Design a protein with these regions (language model features):
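C-terminal catalytic/motor cores of large multi-domain enzyme assemblies
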Residues: 2-254
Length: 254
């Protein structure tokens, strides 16, 4: 009967109305959000990741940055904390090159990379992006600071080129700017690792045998367990922590 033929259409209408009444909002995963979703999903599927953490006393690092900026004079560009952390990253990767790598799954090969292109997470009105500092291993703290500032400005203005958003080999994630202590970030595929830095806050800390208030941060390293074992990952993170606690450690590489 004609009435029977119309019943399926009639039955669907209340369901659609119910969804609208529940306040359900559907947002298409397209554009930047879609690209991020696809990349993070692929990373979770393909990379057997592990994370290690360490707390570090950053008091001397903050003092070293102040001294570096004071030494530059009033007209010199200021070196950002992110740039100092990036410089520590490049030094650590020079000591532990296993983490500047990717895995060729089809060939079943680990590909170690001579050049370091450092990605860093930047939050914008359009979402999270990862601009890339090319050949970061060739730059000092001042050069890193200038390039990080330039790329951050372009990210916020929405003027980054595709070449400035691709090709990173290692990522630095300063999630401390969001006021959090720790995280287990998803590796930026096809990289092999990501260094995370939490907020720097005053905490009770045993310093030189006595209890004192020091500026402490939590560092994390999420790494692809296919490219290295825990010894390498732990050694990398410990070296980063040593540089944070005693910036003079970096001078040994000069």
């Amino acid at each position: 009967q004609p009435a029977t033929a119309e019943q399926p259409a009639t039955a669907e209408q209340p369901a659609a109305a119910a969804s609208a009444a529940d306040g359900e909002v559907r947002i298409a995963l397209r554009g930047l959000r879609g690209v991020v979703a696809d990349k993070m999903s692929r990373s979770r599927r393909e990379i057997p990741e592990a994370t290690c953490w360490v707390d570090a006393d950053a008091t001397e690092l903050l003092a070293a940055r102040r001294a570096m900026n004071a030494a530059g004079g009033p007209d010199a560009p200021k070196i950002s904390l992110l740039a100092v952390l990036a410089r520590i990253c490049t030094a650590a990767l020079a000591r532990f090159p296993e983490l500047n790598a990717r895995v060729d799954t089809e060939a079943r090969e680990i590909v170690r990379l001579e050049r370091l292109h450092l990605g860093f997470a930047a939050q914008t009105d359009r979402g999270l992006v990862v601009p890339v500092v090319r050949d970061a291993h060739t730059r000092g703290a001042e050069s890193l600071s200038e390039e990080l500032a330039r790329l951050t400005g372009s990210a916020r203005a929405g003027t980054l080129t595709p070449g400035e958003l691709t090709g990173s080999t290692f990522t630095l994630n300063n999630y401390g700017v969001f006021g959090v202590d720790g995280s287990t970030p998803i590796i930026n595929h096809p990289e092999a690792a990501m260094l995370g830095v939490g907020r720097i806050v005053p905490k009770p800390w045993v310093h030189e045998g006595e209890l004192a208030v020091r500026h402490v941060t939590q560092l994390s390293l999420t790494f692809d367990h296919r490219v290295c074992d825990g010894g390498v990952a732990g050694g990398f993170l410990r070296y980063v922590a040593d540089c944070v606690e005693q910036p003079a450690v970096l001078l040994r590489g000069i």
